[in-house]
A protein has these predicted regions:
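Short, internal active-site loops enriched in acidic
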Residues: 168-171, 409, 556
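Active-site phosphate/pyrophosphate- and oxyanion-stabilizing loops and adjacent acidic/basic residues
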Residues: 35, 59, 125, 232, ...
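Phosphate/pyrophosphate-binding active-site segments
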Residues: 138-141, 179, 202, 207, ...
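Small/polar loops that bind or transfer phosphate-bearing groups
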Residues: 25-26, 49, 73-74, 219, ...
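Conserved short loop/turn motifs at secondary-structure junctions
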Residues: 219-223, 377, 458-460
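Thiamine diphosphate
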Residues: 109-118, 319-321, 327-329, 333-337, ...
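Active-site diphosphate/adenylate-binding microenvironment
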Residues: 7-11, 15-20, 25-28, 33-38, ...
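N-terminal alpha/beta PP-like core and its mobile active-site loop of ThDP/TPP-dependent enzymes
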Residues: 1-346, 398, 478-481, 518, ...
Length: 576
């Protein structure tokens, strides 16, 4: 029987699962991994500045690769530092394996330094509500069981992070047995309730009788299930307009004639008109929940008169919103494949309604798609955020990947950025932790080394996790960081200023030299004050061959293009 050290077993298993990178912060409780990493040459360790940053990097890696991300740090302070990042992954359904080191079993509850075992801090309990599984692995004997069980829980629907607290005994003990890959079991699994799906297809066909205005709202499930290509094929075949949620931006090309753009927060006028305009007969919701931002502050429930068909692998989402129409438990890919296979049965009705849909869509598109389009080419100073984002979109290759952080810049990017492919617009849209995109870009670049990566972030976000620019620079990753530096917590300031001078002051930030900060960390740094310099500076940064940061001196007094969303949320208080 084959035996190997616990650390070697873990690293070999990660390689067997297709991973090429491990994001980590070294520390005493994970020291045994250091010599093991020297033995496993197929796995590149990436050293983050902060344990939270390591998890954000793993999150970015997962989102960009379609695999899972792995992060490693010590228990106790390390696991507590990871908590927010793990929570962000859970709320967005990002598959992560988070591993923390723990003291030897015989030292638990004896005052050992950084003991976070179940008898003290109990970091598995800290992680439990943030993960799909949080478990202590006490010995190497049960490492094989818990490792594979954790990955099974991670890949099961809905996907999300898992946590293993690895005692010293588990790391240095001998693990018996060969590893059997887990991901392969899930690669072929496309669950679908056939009966519910067949009923949905009949309902779609019926809707094309007297009522033919059908649209799709595509959510993150389309991306998770690799269903974007099939969605495009079906939409084109029967002239079905497609809107996406902000989380799923890019799963349908936004320059496609059938694209409505984003619906919900930072959404387009076309998507709002199609879904809430009162003429829609049937809305096919693919892989999206009905959270606040993806439903225009839940107004889709009240304002849309359309019958809804909801396809999702998340049973909680289906049961919570079952009253909205017909629910189909299952993957978007499997449902769209069934739709393709049943084309002969549903084609007469869908084809009959296609001309009517084209007329309806043409009427919608006769109006402008975006709000305040004059802001895309303003030549005023300080620079308007929309102007900077438009210039960056022009500079970044079509298949480039944008990571967007949390703040006012998220609204500008969500509204004005054009995404053409799945996994090319990446943002933590549910929990929305500030600074997430800065380290996440490291993971994205590791997963997609041939793609150009740009981060749209803010000065408030830089205060949170800007130090991870040094990680990108350390590994000479050619990431371009664009800091929309408006000397404020943008969204919060826009609200606070209404209440007087002190609230506005409390939400303002000193005008830091972020370009100088980047240079101090080993990156190239540029400062732009004149919008006429944006194009040349972005090109220079993209050509730098290493990490670059552009400090864009931006205007904070710029209302965000979320007018439709605000109309639905007028009675509520917001913060981001």
């Amino acid at each position: 029987m084959t035996t190997k050290l616990g650390t070697d077993y873990i690293l070999d298993a990660l390689v067997a699962e297709g991973l090429a990178h491990l994001f980590m912060v070294p520390g005493g409780l994970v020291d045994p991994f250091l010599p093991a990493l020297a033995r496993q040459t197929k796995l590149q360790p990436v050293i983050a500045a902060h344990e939270g940053g390591a998890v954000y990097m793993a999150d970015g890696y997962a989102r960009a690769s379609g695999r899972f991300g792995a992060a490693l740090g010590i228990g106790g302070p390390g696991s507590c530092n990871m908590a927010t990042a793990v929570a962000a992954a859970k709320t967005d359904g990002s598959p992560l394996l988070v591993m923390t080191g723990e003291v030897p079993v015989d030292l638990e509850d004896r005052g050992a330094f950084q003991d976070a075992s179940q008898a003290t801090l109990n970091d598995t309990a800290v992680m439990a509500p943030l993960t799909h599984l949080s478990q202590t692995v006490a010995t190497a004997n049960n490492l094989n069981h818990w490792f594979r069980h954790a990955l099974t829980a991670m890949w099961s629907q809905p996907r999300g992070p898992v946590h293993l607290s690895l005692t010293h005994d588990a790391l240095v003990g001998e693990c018996v047995g060969a590893y059997v890959q887990v991901a392969g079991f899930f690669a072929q699994a496309q669950p679908l309730s056939t009966e519910a799906a067949e009923t949905a297809l009949r309902l779609l066909a019926d809707a094309n009788g007297a009522k033919s205005r059908i649209a799709v709202l595509a959510g993150a499930g389309v991306e998770h299930d690799a269903a974007a290509a099939r969605l495009k094929e079906i939409a084109e075949r029967w002239s079905i307009p497609v809107a996406t949620t902000l989380r799923a931006k890019g799963v349908f090309p936004e320059d496609h004639p059938l694209s409505l753009g984003v619906f919900g927060y930072a959404g387009t006028r076309h998507a709002t008109a199609a879904i809430l305009g009162g003429e829609l007969d049937c809305l096919l919701v693919l892989g999206s929940g009905f959270n606040e931002r993806d439903t225009m502050h839940w107004t889709v429930r009240e304002r849309s008169k359309a019958f809804m068909i909801h396809v999702n692998t998340d049973m909680e989402e289906l049961t919570a919103n079952g009253e909205l129409g017909h629910v189909v438990p299952g993957s978007c890919h499997a449902f769209l494949d069934l739709m393709h296979k049943r084309a002969a049965d549903i084609a007469p009705a869908l084809t009959a309604g296609a001309a009517h849909r084209r007329e309806w869509l043409a009427a919608i598109k006769a109006a402008p798609r975006l709000y305040d389009i004059e802001n895309l080419s303003r030549r005023t100073t300080p620079i308007h955020p929309a102007t900077a984002i438009a210039a960056l979109r022009q500079a970044l290759p079509r298949d480039g990947i944008a990571l967007v952080d949390s703040g006012a810049h998220r609204a500008f990017a969500g509204h004005y950025w054009t995404a053409y492919e799945p996994r090319t617009y990446i943002s933590a849209t549910n929990l929305g932790p500030m600074g997430w995109a800065i380290p996440a870009a490291v993971g994205v670049q590791c997963a997609q080394p041939e793609r150009r990566i740009a981060v749209i972030t803010g000065d408030g976000c830089m205060q949170m996790h800007g130090i991870e620019v040094q990680t990108a620079a350390r590994y000479r990753l050619p990431i371009v960081y664009v800091v929309i530096n408006n000397s404020a917590l943008g969204n919060v300031w826009l609200r606070a200023r209404q209440y007087g001078a002190l609230p506005a002051e409390l939400t303002s930030i000193p005008d830091h030299d972020w370009a100088g900060f980047a240079r101090a960390l080993g990156a190239q740094g540029f400062t732009v004050r004149d919008p006429a310099q944006l194009d040349a500076t972005f090109q220079q940064a993209l050509a730098a061959g290493t990490t670059a940061l552009i400090d864009v001196k931006a205007d904070k007094n710029c209302p965000t293009p979320v007018y439709d969303f605000n109309a639905g949320a007028r009675a509520w208080s917001y913060h981001e």
